[in-house]
């Protein structure tokens, strides 16, 4: 009868050697993949440089770069050999490939003295220093905070939130103040609907507390165009997006945001009514401490086609 020890399976020494060999092979594959992505980034940077020299704004150039779609539409002055190559290879990119590609692309663009900024993707628009809001204790407090950033603010009151939104949408006012969040941080669905229908942006937000209450409301400064706050020290900055649920895998987008240094501040689902039937959206607010969102914007305009930036803003403390 065999001893118990003879029935045991004792892994041979070759097992550890196999593991090392597999790890080395995996590392080699990763290096090869990075080389492939670097080649793609070089081709893409050439493509974008040509578009830039033809006078195309970065926001349009990155949209044309589209690695997910056919190369049927191409700018006349672009390097026509580059785009089909990128389009063909882009269909095989994994979620991680996409983030690495954008990082490499940013490096290649910098070598060509092309350094996109947030304002290239979300062009700021000059607005009248005319404010409007529905007068109440909280709105008065919010106005005192927001007005500090302007040279000659003027004000008129609106009878309703809808009237305030219409004043901005129609150009009678440059900014309106709206209650964005209830006490406890709950977003007001009616405000999200107004912003969606009128295609307005968030320029800034601030908490307001009324008569010394511990939990306050959050008011937003709303405008027709983007207002890009400067990156200052370690201050928090926020990027807010709205995208249809079918636009892209949410986990992939959030992983990319984290890769580029942005953390999730808030996510909620919205049911918004437009000109046609209601659609389901994600409302996503991302936070970055003392840094910009340039790489993430490059990613979004390259790989996420159906989304709406609502604004880059700071949270002003009253």
Where are these regions (language model features)?
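Domain-level signature for soluble enzymes in the chorismate/prephenate branch of the shikimate pathway
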Residues: 1-318
């Amino acid at each position: 009868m065999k001893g118990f020890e003879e029935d045991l399976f004792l892994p041979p020494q070759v097992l550890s050697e196999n593991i090392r060999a597999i790890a080395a092979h995996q590392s080699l594959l990763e290096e090869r993949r990075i080389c492939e992505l670097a080649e793609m980034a070089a081709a893409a940077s050439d493509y974008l440089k040509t578009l830039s020299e033809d006078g195309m704004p970065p926001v349009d150039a990155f949209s044309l770069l589209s690695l997910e779609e056919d190369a049927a539409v191409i700018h006349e002055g672009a390097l026509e050999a580059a785009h089909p190559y990128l389009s063909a290879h882009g269909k095989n990119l994994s979620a991680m490939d996409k983030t690495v590609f954008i990082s490499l692309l940013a490096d290649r663009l910098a070598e060509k003295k092309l350094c996109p900024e947030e304002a290239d993707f979300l062009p700021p628009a000059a607005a009248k220093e005319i404010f409007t809001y529905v007068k109440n204790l909280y709105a008065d407090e919010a106005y005192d905070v927001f007005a500090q950033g302007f040279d000659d603010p003027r004000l008129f009151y609106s009878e309703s939130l809808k009237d305030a939104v219409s004043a901005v949408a129609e150009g009678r006012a440059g900014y309106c103040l709206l209650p964005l969040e209830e006490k406890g941080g709950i977003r007001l669905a009616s405000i999200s609907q107004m912003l969606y229908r009128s295609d307005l942006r968030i320029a800034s937000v601030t908490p307001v507390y009324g008569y010394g209450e511990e939990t306050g409301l959050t008011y937003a400064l709303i405008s027709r165009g983007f207002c890009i706050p400067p990156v200052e020290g370690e201050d928090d900055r926020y990027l807010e997006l709205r995208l249809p649920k079918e636009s892209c895998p949410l986990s992939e987008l959030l992983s990319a945001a984290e890769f580029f240094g942005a953390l999730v501040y808030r996510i909620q689902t919205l049911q918004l009514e437009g000109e046609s039937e209601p659609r389901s959206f994600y409302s996503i607010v991302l936070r970055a401490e003392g840094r910009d969102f340039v790489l993430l914007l490059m990613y979004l305009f390259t790989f996420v086609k159906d989304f709406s930036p609502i604004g880059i803003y700071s949270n002003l403390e009253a």
